[in-house]
């Protein structure tokens, strides 16, 4: 008999040339029911539908025998005679010959059937898509194009199907059945293939009734394939051969592929694989060369052996033995044992399948249960046709126990037990139900498999898999959810679909959910939300929770905004019940969502975080009137942007419209592209398509096109936010307002939070979107997000999820991208966003409005409304900061504010008061202020409200928020372009006071008191003047501007959202103070003049909020284009910091005295850092920092006026990343408590280590104790000591650690020892007063002192002394500035570089100069350095200023802040302890510290780097003093690189806490390949390190290794089949040896001579060992099968690499210290010769050394190396274990 062709299946044919016997009974009507042709042999032309031959004979069958009589050569007449002679039945032996693909399967009857009942799926191979990729079909993806599903057949074909919302899995299977002429489709199923953790391949069964839209929705279609497989096997292959030869042939091909691709759960024996390979060769050659003798040599020549053998077999068996065995078996097959003839191909295939059938895992599927405890341990179950449900005792010996047969199963139900775990209850007749706990993906597959076997073996209509009625209804759909479910028919799903669809979809029809379809407008909203949320979805994907981890496909699938948890997918498929739909329709027309079940009940609250309240409100508003209308199917609305609007019924068309709106333009296929059956839908679809295209374009703009914020939109959003405080979501406007307000008001979160919210509201959407509608919707989205946050009290999570830091705000292409630092700061707001405003009644006051309904606010002019919105925000934000200030100073300040009803008056009064206070303040007063400040600080941390005082912390907070908000509003809306409107001014004024008070609690106290009297007028004037001054005379008003800048910066930083007003107030107050102090009036420029300056400068602080407000739109645009991206978002969120920062650079200007600079910078930096960080820390830090800033601002104003200030574009104080970092919660969501504790320990370790490194060799080298302690006016002795450099008198590390001040700082404003601070401040102020710059610095120190305390507390590494000057955060601020950059979007960092690039560079240089450079490269003379040390106030000149300011602001800046007090001021390095603490704590601890904190910076840096590598290089994230080694030249380029490296390294440490970072890594690291990784490692290993940049290179290379680590684990190759399993043990052993070797090499590094050459040689050797270790790790990762094991290995190795980075730092610092000591000895000798001059130089050098090489001052035997080594050794030991 003729053998079948090898290519039969390849041509989409059922097996050809297969003989089969068919018994056909004569029918009285149809006879035998087929028409035969006249060919010889006779061919069946057609089969009569409904006749007896249907499903027995096929068109094209050759009749070979009739009743066992051969008629192949008989004449036609004989054939007819035989047929007629058969009376009742006839037995035909027919041969199905190979025919053309088309004619073989479409008979006339079938065509008629198709016409009458067309299938809902059409093949679309001929469809031409624009610019299609020739390889598109072969790519392993679920979708070919948006609504075209690719199905991979086992015969090598790829079929593509267009689908709409009605198309189900069953439709696709029926179409394939027709195409492949399959009889029993019950054996088949569509499955999704993905790489499982333990197995190379896992298949997720799709239920028949599952709509394809859900499948696509719930699947990450980039990483999965849809396969058409036989999933329900026959008990014996012979049965299938008899019943359905085509299915038998398909089973053979599938099994053959499984063997070659090693898809089995267990490894078959090599002998079995050899036998199967021989059969495979025999079958293939027999089919293609029927008459040829089969020899192995011929096979090798023609095909080679690879196509027939699994890869692992080639490695396990020697080639010689393999050939020998194959040859023997081929000979045996060619000689039949019984008759000696050659066996047929059919027999060989049957034998092939029977051999496989003996493997339990071939026909059966293994399921692992979840063990709860020792009593109930995990078990393994086997489900298969021959095993039923069996318990596996020993898989190797096939020892199993049957638990139940399929015939006894009556019902299967799934219940959600807990996250990711389902309880499977299988009801068994006459026995107790079988209750199992499984992970959701396993559980759904388990239930589907059993249900399929019951249908196959028992009753095809039997449904055993059902969802329990008792199961809770899915949570009501939230807007985001709704958006996804309803609007993204194609896209929303994740692989979880398998679980969810299986679980819920069996009994219900997906259409129910479709009844409530939002109108197309909604879809627009949704599209916006979708765009907004898509980033979040991606981040969530990368961030896997328990459920997600379980569902790998889900993990990969793009997350829908509405579907935060893929795990819920288990239920997700189920449709909402009718009653539920009705209820949901009442509340929210679109509330019902088919996917609602995908949300875990436990996750419901969390899910809310993903919904945009504004969008929800908008939807409600739009849908409300239409409630009566015909509901559309929301189910189909869930479409990805990439998905096409599926053709559908009228019911679905409405949804589709919405859906299509979300789809890209490409989504809409041309009219002929779709299914024929859907042609009637084309007209409507076309309309939808046009909308869809628009939406898509909008989405593209949002995602890819930098767009400036739209003023009107932003303004509207802010105003809406404010309004929302009072109103629930009712109308679109109300919803928007409510969202904003709820974000602000409901959660009187720290100002940062409010600022963050505003930013989120404005930036993500408005900036991205090009249309006002979209913007508003986007803003609404943000508002909704905020509302959700409010509801769930999880700001961090909300922000992180909703505004994907990386995705949206930090994206390179996002002009207004915000840095993570800012985001963290915002998120870490002391108060949760959801928290109600402490004193709602005060809000109106702060707002400048009488409390009234939101409507009243709405009525206000835009600017006023904005102001009000900002005010509201300020209230929300300010509470954290203002409590102390407001309580202490704001009371007086605010009380006047209410009195000053004129908006301008309040603010003006504030400014005036500040100015007057500043100018009039005596040193004693300053001291008093400083003294008071600590108290305020203490209060602020707690946000104390004074019931008696009209101004409460809440009011202050509100004021700050409002200010920020106003600024943001102003920034957002150009409407505020004019000087702030009365409302605005009033807001600013009223707010300004609180803000000022908050900003500098101590300073503001006095200032406020004094300001109150004259606040109204002065405030008003100074506002205008300030604005003018800032813009018109950056230099002249520099002092005043700097002052106001500082204030505003702080304010800005605190209430980022309220930024503009707050900044303005601060600036105004500063200006007033500065003007009075300086005698300069800011009036020169005029508010309008100031605006342009602000825009250009990118600094909005001095000019005033209005300038910023006015210029914000422009500026935001500018920023968008350039640095503004950050600024844009910051403008609202960041603008305060930007403004303050810019002003700080421009006003505060680097030119100011060092103190002023540092302070100015601090303010600017701090504001930046603060705003993001302050949101959290603001509450406690704000008062400390603010008060200091106020003083600083006041003094600074003088100094500023003295020296010109360079306007510099300031960086947004907030960076979403920072905010996120600040919002540790996001991290926490990913981390277990244990992990967090470990992180804390690691950070503390690092901190202590760095601290030790930074410790001076001896106290003698340290500045005087007075210098050390007094330096920080608000510092606690512990804090003073905390700075390694200023370790003079002090406390032990333990004492410092336990010091209350730290707690205070963390909790709220640090209560640094106030007494010392006042004295310090007094001194500083005295110094500052003598020279305006100095005064500024002094006040800055004083004001910053509390902040410093915070920072100090937060960073023991940071030199408190230096910081005291810039307490606002000279070093921290600088870092902050850098942190601000960090906070700002990575772009911001780039753009901002926050000063002009030159300035930034200078800043870097300056920081290096002070910290790192023995000689300030900036041209800072030793004298200047000294002056800076002595009193930052000393004017270094504009250049110095800018340098210094930038230094302070520069993220990369290593700040060496000399204490103004000590004659030999020590340079202080800001190394935040916070780094070691959790981000939230850090943020709270110190605004500047946050920025400076290693951890924060790293966080930010890391994000930044992920966003923009070049940006990351620009800044030093790790503020560590570096001593320049001989021959080493550090310039502004190198410093940022080093900084970035440090940040990256530390970021790695924080990566677990930075969802953004991890997500970014996942995205960036997925391209790694095995060979590429090894090549990279080998290239790095070849590096040798020497002077001058060896340490830097080593760090960079170590960072590269970290990248390689993550890339490997994230690489798809790592999850591909692992053939080298046998080598795992070898690699593991090798890895352990490498760990030991590394430990030894690291010890050598610690013990080597501290000379640079020897140290670098030791480091080179240790790095080579580390590279070898990483190489071994990579090799191991690529062969380890378990994802869990890979992650565990990664964690261990990562820990070692991170510790190694600390060792490098310690080595560098130790070496630098050694050199520094030598230099110091020489200097001492020179000092003897020239005591005075050399003393000064030594001070300068010491400062530089301290800042840049503080670590270098420790003796070689310092505990640094020991500490590092102990940590390192400990980690290595752990790893080796």
From Swiss-Prot:
Residues 1134-1168, 1732-1751 have a biased composition (Low complexity). InterPro entries: Band_41_domain (IPR019749), FAK1-like_FERM_C (IPR049385), FERM/acyl-CoA-bd_prot_sf (IPR014352), FERM_2 (IPR035963), FERM_central (IPR019748), FERM_domain (IPR000299), FRMPD1/3/4_FERM_C (IPR041779), PDZ (IPR001478). Coiled coil: none annotated. Transmembrane segments: none annotated. GO terms for cellular component: cytoskeleton; plasma membrane; secretory granule membrane; tertiary granule membrane. This is FERM and PDZ domain-containing protein 3. Residues 555-564 have a biased composition (Basic and acidic residues). It comes from the Eukaryota. Gene3D superfamilies: 1.20.80.10, 2.30.42.10, Pleckstrin-homology domain (PH domain)/Phosphotyrosine-binding domain (PTB). Residues 649-659 have a biased composition (Acidic residues). Residues 502-511, 840-850, 1015-1035, 1046-1056, 1094-1111, 1172-1202 have a biased composition (Polar residues). It comes from Homo sapiens (Human). Residues 21-98 form the PDZ domain. It holds the Pfam family FERM_C_FAK1. Disulfide bonds: none annotated. Residues 491-520, 555-574, 622-697, 832-871, 1014-1216, 1309-1346, 1732-1765 are annotated as: Disordered. Residues 147-461 form the FERM domain.
């Amino acid at each position: 008999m003729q053998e079948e062709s090898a290519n039969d299946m390849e041509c989409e044919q059922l097996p050809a040339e297969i003989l089969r016997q068919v018994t056909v009974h004569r029918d009285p009507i149809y006879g035998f029911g087929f028409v035969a042709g006249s060919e010889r042999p006779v061919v069946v032309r057609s089969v009569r539908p409904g006749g007896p031959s249907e499903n027995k004979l096929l068109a094209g069958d050759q009749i070979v025998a009739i009743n066992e009589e051969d008629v192949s050569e008989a004449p036609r007449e004989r054939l007819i005679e035989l047929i007629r002679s058969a009376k009742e039945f006839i037995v035909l032996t027919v041969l199905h010959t190979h025919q053309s693909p088309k004619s073989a399967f479409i008979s006339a009857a079938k065509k008629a059937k198709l016409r009458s009942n067309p299938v809902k799926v059409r093949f679309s191979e001929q469809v031409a898509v624009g610019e299609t990729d020739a390889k598109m079909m072969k790519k392993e993806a679920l979708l070919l194009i948006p609504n075209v599903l690719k199905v991979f057949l086992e015969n090598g074909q790829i079929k593509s199907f267009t689908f709409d919302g009605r198309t189900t899995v069953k439709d696709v299977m029926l179409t394939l059945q027709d195409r492949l002429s399959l009889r029993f489709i019950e054996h088949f199923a569509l499955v999704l293939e993905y790489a499982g953790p333990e197995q190379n391949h896992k298949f997720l069964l799709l239920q028949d009734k599952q709509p394809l839209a859900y499948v696509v929705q719930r699947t990450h279609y980039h990483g999965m394939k849809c396969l058409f497989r036989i999933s329900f096997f026959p008990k014996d292959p012979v049965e299938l051969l008899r019943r359905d030869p085509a299915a038998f042939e398909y089973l053979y091909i599938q099994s053959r592929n499984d063997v070659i691709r090693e898809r089995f759960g267990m490894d078959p024996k090599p002998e079995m694989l050899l036998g199967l390979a021989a059969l495979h060769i025999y079958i293939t050659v027999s089919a293609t060369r029927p008459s040829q003798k089969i020899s192995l040599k011929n096979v090798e020549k023609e095909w080679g052996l690879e196509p027939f053998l699994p890869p692992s077999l080639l490695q396990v068996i020697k080639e010689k033995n393999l050939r020998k065995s194959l040859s023997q078996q081929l000979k045996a097959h060619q000689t039949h044992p019984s008759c000696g003839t050659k066996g047929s191909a059919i027999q060989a295939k049957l034998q092939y399948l029977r051999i496989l059938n003996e493997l339990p895992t071939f026909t059966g599927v293994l399921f692992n249960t979840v063990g709860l405890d020792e009593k109930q341990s995990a078990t393994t179950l086997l489900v298969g046709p021959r095993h039923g449900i069996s318990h596996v005792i020993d898989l190797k010996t096939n020892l199993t126990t049957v638990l139940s047969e399929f015939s006894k199963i009556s019902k299967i139900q799934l219940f959600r037990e807990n996250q990711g775990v389902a309880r499977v209850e299988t009801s068994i007749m006459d026995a107790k139900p079988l209750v199992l706990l499984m992970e959701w993906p396993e559980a759904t597959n388990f239930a589907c498999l059993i249900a399929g076997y019951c249908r196959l073996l028992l009753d095809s209509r039997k449904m055993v898999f059902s969802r329990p009625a008792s199961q809770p209804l899915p949570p009501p759909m939230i807007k985001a959810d709704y958006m996804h479910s309803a609007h993204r028919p194609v896209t929303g799903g994740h692989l979880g679909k398998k679980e969810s669809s299986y679980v819920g979809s069996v009994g219900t029809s997906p259409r129910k959910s479709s009844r409530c379809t939002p109108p197309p407008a909604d879809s627009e909203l949704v599209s916006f939300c979708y765009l907004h949320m898509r980033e979040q979805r991606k981040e969530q994907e990368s961030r896997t929770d328990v459920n997600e981890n379980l569902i790998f496909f889900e993990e990969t699938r793009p997350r829908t905004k509405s579907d935060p948890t893929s795990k819920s997918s288990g239920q997700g498929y189920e449709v909402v019940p009718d009653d539920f739909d009705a209820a949901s329709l009442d509340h929210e027309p679109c509330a019902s969502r088919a996917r609602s079940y995908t949300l875990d009940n436990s996750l419901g609250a969390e899910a809310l975080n993903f919904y945009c309240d504004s969008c929800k409100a908008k939807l409600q508003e739009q849908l409300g009137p239409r409630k009566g209308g015909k509901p559309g199917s929301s189910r189909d609305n869930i479409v990805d942007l990439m998905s096409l609007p599926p053709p559908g019924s009228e019911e679905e068309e409405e949804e589709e419209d919405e859906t299509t709106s979300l789809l890209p333009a490409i989504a809409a296929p041309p009219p002929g592209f779709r299914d024929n059956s859907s042609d009637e839908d084309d007209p409507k679809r076309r309309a939808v398509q046009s909308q869809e295209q628009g939406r898509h374009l909008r989405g593209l703009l949002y995602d890819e096109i930098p767009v400036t914020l739209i003023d009107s939109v932003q303004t509207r959003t802010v105003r809406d936010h404010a309004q929302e405080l009072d109103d629930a979501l009712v109308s679109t406007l109300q919803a928007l307002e409510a969202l904003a307000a709820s974000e602000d008001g409901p959660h009187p979160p720290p100002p940062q939070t409010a600022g963050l919210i505003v930013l989120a509201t404005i930036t993500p959407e408005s900036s991205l979107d090009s249309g006002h509608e979209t913007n508003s919707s986007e803003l609404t989205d943000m508002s909704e997000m905020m509302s959700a946050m409010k509801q769930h009290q999880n700001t961090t999570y909300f922000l992180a999820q909703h505004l994907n830091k990386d995705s949206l705000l930090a994206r390179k292409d996002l002009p207004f991208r915000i840095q993570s630092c800012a985001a963290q700061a915002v998120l870490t707001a002391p108060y949760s966003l959801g928290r109600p405003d402490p004193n709602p009644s005060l809000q109106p006051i702060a707002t400048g409005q009488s409390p009234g309904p939101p409507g009243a606010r709405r009525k206000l002019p835009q600017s006023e409304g904005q102001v009000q919105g900002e005010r509201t925000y300020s209230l929300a934000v300010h509470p954290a900061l203002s409590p102390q200030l407001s309580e202490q100073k704001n009371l007086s300040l605010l009380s006047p504010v209410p009195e000053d009803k004129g908006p301008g008056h309040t603010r003006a009064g504030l400014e005036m008061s500040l100015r007057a206070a500043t100018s009039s303040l005596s040193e004693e007063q300053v001291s008093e202020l400083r003294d008071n400040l600590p108290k305020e600080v203490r209060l602020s941390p707690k946000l104390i409200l004074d019931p008696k005082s009209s101004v409460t912390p809440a009011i202050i907070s509100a004021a700050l928020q409002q200010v920020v908000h106003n600024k943001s509003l102003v920034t957002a809306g150009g409407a505020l372009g004019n000087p702030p409107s009365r409302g605005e001014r009033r807001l600013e004024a009223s707010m300004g006071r609180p803000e000022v008070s908050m900003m500098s609690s101590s300073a503001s106290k006095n200032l406020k008191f004094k300001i109150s009297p004259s606040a109204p007028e002065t405030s008003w004037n100074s506002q205008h003047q300030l604005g003018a001054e800032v813009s018109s005379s950056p230099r002249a008003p520099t002092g005043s501007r700097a002052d106001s800048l500082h204030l505003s910066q702080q304010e800005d930083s605190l209430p980022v959202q309220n930024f503009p007003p707050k900044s303005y107030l601060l600036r105004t107050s500063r200006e007033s103070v500065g003007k009075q102090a300086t005698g300069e009036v800011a009036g020169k420029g005029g508010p309008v003049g100031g605006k342009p300056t602000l825009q250009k400068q990118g600094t909005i602080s001095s000019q005033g909020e209005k300038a910023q407000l006015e210029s914000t739109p422009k500026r935001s645009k500018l920023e968008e284009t350039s640095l503004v991206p950050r600024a844009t978002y910051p403008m609202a969120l960041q603008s305060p910091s930007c403004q303050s920062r810019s002003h700080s650079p421009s006003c505060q200007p680097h030119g100011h005295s060092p103190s002023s600079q540092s302070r100015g910078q601090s303010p600017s930096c701090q504001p930046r850092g603060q705003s993001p960080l302050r949101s959290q820390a603001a509450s406690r830090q704000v008062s400390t920092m603010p008060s200091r800033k106020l003083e600083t601002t006041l003094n600074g104003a003088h100094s500023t006026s003295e020296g010109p200030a360079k306007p510099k574009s300031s960086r947004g104080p907030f960076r979403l990343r920072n905010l996120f970092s600040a919002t540790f919660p996001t991290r926490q969501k990913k981390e277990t408590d244990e992990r967090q504790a470990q992180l804390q320990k690691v950070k503390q370790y690092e901190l202590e280590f760095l601290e030790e490194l930074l410790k001076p060799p001896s106290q003698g080298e340290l500045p005087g104790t007075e210098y050390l302690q007094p330096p920080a006016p608000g510092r606690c002795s512990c804090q003073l000591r905390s700075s390694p450099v200023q370790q003079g008198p002090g406390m032990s590390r333990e004492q410092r650690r336990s010091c209350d001040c730290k707690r205070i700082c963390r909790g709220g404003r640090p209560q640094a020892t106030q007494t010392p601070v006042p004295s310090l401040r007094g001194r500083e102020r005295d110094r500052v007063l003598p020279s305006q710059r100095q005064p500024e610095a002094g006040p800055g120190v004083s004001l910053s002192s509390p902040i410093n305390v915070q920072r100090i507390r937060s960073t023991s590494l940071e030199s408190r002394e230096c910081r005291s000057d810039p307490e606002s955060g000279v070093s921290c601020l600088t870092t902050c500035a850098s942190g601000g950059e960090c906070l700002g979007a990575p772009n911001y960092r780039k753009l901002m570089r926050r000063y002009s690039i030159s300035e930034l560079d200078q800043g870097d240089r300056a920081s290096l100069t002070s910290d790192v450079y023995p000689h300030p490269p900036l041209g800072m003379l030793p004298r200047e350095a000294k002056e800076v040390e002595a009193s930052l106030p000393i004017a270094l000149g504009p250049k110095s200023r800018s340098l210094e300011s930038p230094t302070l602001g520069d993220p990369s800046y290593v700040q060496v802040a000399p204490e103004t007090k000590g004659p030999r001021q020590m340079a202080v390095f800001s190394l935040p302890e916070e780094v070691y603490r959790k981000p939230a704590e850090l943020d709270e601890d110190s605004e500047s510290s946050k920025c400076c904190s290693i951890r924060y910076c790293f966080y930010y840096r890391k994000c930044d780097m992920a966003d923009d590598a070049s940006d990351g290089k620009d800044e030093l994230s790790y503020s560590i003093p570096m001593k320049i080694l001989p021959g080493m030249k550090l310039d502004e380029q190198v410093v940022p690189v080093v900084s970035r490296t440090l940040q990256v390294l530390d970021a790695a440490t924080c990566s677990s806490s930075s969802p953004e970072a991890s997500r970014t890594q996942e995205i960036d690291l997925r391209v790694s390949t095995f060979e590429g990784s090894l090549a990279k490692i080998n290239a790095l290993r070849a590096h040798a390190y020497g002077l001058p940049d060896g340490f830097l290179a080593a760090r960079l290379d170590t960072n590269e290794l970290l990248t390689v680590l993550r890339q490997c684990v994230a690489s798809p190759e790592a999850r591909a089949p692992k053939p080298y399993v046998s080598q795992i043990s070898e690699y593991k052993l090798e890895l352990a040896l490498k760990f030991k070797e590394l430990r030894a090499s690291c010890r050598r590094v610690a013990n080597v001579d501290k000379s640079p050459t020897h140290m670098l040689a030791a480091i080179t050797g240790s790095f080579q060992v580390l590279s070898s270790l990483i190489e071994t790790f990579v090799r191991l990762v690529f062969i380890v099968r378990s994802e869990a094991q890979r992650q565990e290995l990664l964690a261990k190795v990562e820990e070692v690499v991170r510790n190694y980075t600390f060792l490098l730092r310690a080595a560098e610092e130790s070496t630098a210290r050694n050199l520094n000591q030598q230099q110091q000895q020489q200097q001492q000798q020179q000092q003897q010769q020239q005591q005075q001059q050399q003393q000064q130089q030594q001070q300068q050098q010491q400062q530089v050394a301290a800042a840049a090489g503080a670590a270098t001052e420790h003796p070689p035997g310092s505990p640094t190396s020991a500490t590092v080594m102990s940590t390192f050794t400990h980690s290595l030991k752990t790893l080796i274990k």
